[in-house]
């Protein structure tokens, strides 16, 4: 009993700054970009998505992303997967360096999940069962991503699942919140988001091959090996870039050429950086910063292009 009390007393209280660090705002692009894409797509297609629903969708996505990040950090720490020797930044490893009770992080993760659930219910209120079913699939993925007997993040399908759920289901659910209908065609135009987000996980797993082998994880890079993973990574990156040039034109006509201009001006160096790296453990911090930046500036160019198209249509209405 005394030992248990001493163990509890050694922990520091969770601060607001640490709660924000566990939410990992630098990764929110993986949820914000798909949400904004779905909002802009809905406006372009004439779906009745009002500002309240749009804001609620955006909030739900941010809270669910925060829940994924927090619960994933908790599970990795409890399992001993994350340590100070694993090339992680101090601000990105609160449980490793912060001295807080892991249970506090777990509870915070569930709080983020609950907030995301409430925001999602607000966004889909009165829209029928379709957005609720899509949201339920996303919520189940959040819970199964790091937890359960067979976590999604530890499977070879992790990249596909994370890319499809974040990059595909978020836009699909956003459009469904507008009119209660299923719009599967949005998944085609969401391909840059699906690939970009999937590559975030591949960046992490590609750098962590040796660490994941020790932890008993069966990730895709572990099966492929670093050399073949790197080839696949670079192929998908080039394909992602090509889609960013082509799909906006297919979706918005000549206005879509703006995306290519923005890519050349702001995203070229970001893509060049991630193509030059080799998914080595010692490059993990650079690799993760690079792929997040590529998502922000690459998929961000797509979002800005759609926003401009929406604005131009509003001005000509």
Question: Can you name each region flagged by the protein language model?
Answer:
Residues 249-314:
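Extended hydrophobic alpha-helices typical of membrane-associated regions
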Residues 63-88, 199-221:
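Acidic (Asp/Glu-rich) catalytic motifs at the cytosolic membrane interface
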Residues 161-209, 215, 227-230:
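Functional transmembrane core segments of multi-pass inner-membrane proteins
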Residues 29-38, 160-175, 222-226, 288-302:
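Small-residue-rich segments of transmembrane alpha-helices in multi-pass membrane proteins
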Residues 92-184:
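Intramembrane alpha-helical segments
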Residues 2-56, 60, 149-153, 158, ...:
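Topogenic membrane-insertion module of multi-pass membrane proteins
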Residues 84-126, 221-253, 292-298:
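Multi-pass membrane catalytic core of lipid/isoprenoid biosynthesis enzymes
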Residues 36-37, 46-74, 133-140, 184-203:
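Membrane-embedded alpha-helical segments that form the functional core of polytopic membrane enzymes
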């Amino acid at each position: 009993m005394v030992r248990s009390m001493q163990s509890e007393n050694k922990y520091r209280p969770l601060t607001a700054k640490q709660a924000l660090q566990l939410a990992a705002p630098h990764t929110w692009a993986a949820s914000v970009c798909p949400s904004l894409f779905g909002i802009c797509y809905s406006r372009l297609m004439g779906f009745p998505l009002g500002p309240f629903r749009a804001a609620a969708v955006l909030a739900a996505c941010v809270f669910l992303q925060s829940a994924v990040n927090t619960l994933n950090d908790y599970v990795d720490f409890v399992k001993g997967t994350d340590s100070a020797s694993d090339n992680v930044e101090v601000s990105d490893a609160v449980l490793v360096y912060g001295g807080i009770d892991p249970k506090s992080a777990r509870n915070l993760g569930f709080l983020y999940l609950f907030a995301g659930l409430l925001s999602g219910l607000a966004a889909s209120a009165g829209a029928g069962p379709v957005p609720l079913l899509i949201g339920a699939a996303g919520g189940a993925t959040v819970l199964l991503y790091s937890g359960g007997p067979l976590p999604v993040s530890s499977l070879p399908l992790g990249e596909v699942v994370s890319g499809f759920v974040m990059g595909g289901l978020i836009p699909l659910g956003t459009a469904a919140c507008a009119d209660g209908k299923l719009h599967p065609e949005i998944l085609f135009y969401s391909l840059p988001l699906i690939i970009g987000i999937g590559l975030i996980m591949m960046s992490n797993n590609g750098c962590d091959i040796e660490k994941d082998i020790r932890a008993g994880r069966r990730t895709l890079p572990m099966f492929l090996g670093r050399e073949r993973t790197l080839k696949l990574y670079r192929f998908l990156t080039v394909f992602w870039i090509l889609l960013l040039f082509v799909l906006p034109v297919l979706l918005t006509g000549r206005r879509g050429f703006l995306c290519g201009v923005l890519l050349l001006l702001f995203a070229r160096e970001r893509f060049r950086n991630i193509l030059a790296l080799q998914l080595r453990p010692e490059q993990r911090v650079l690799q993760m910063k690079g792929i997040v930046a590529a998502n922000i500036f690459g998929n961000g160019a797509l979002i800005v292009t759609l926003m401009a198209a929406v604005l131009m249509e509003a001005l000509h209405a």
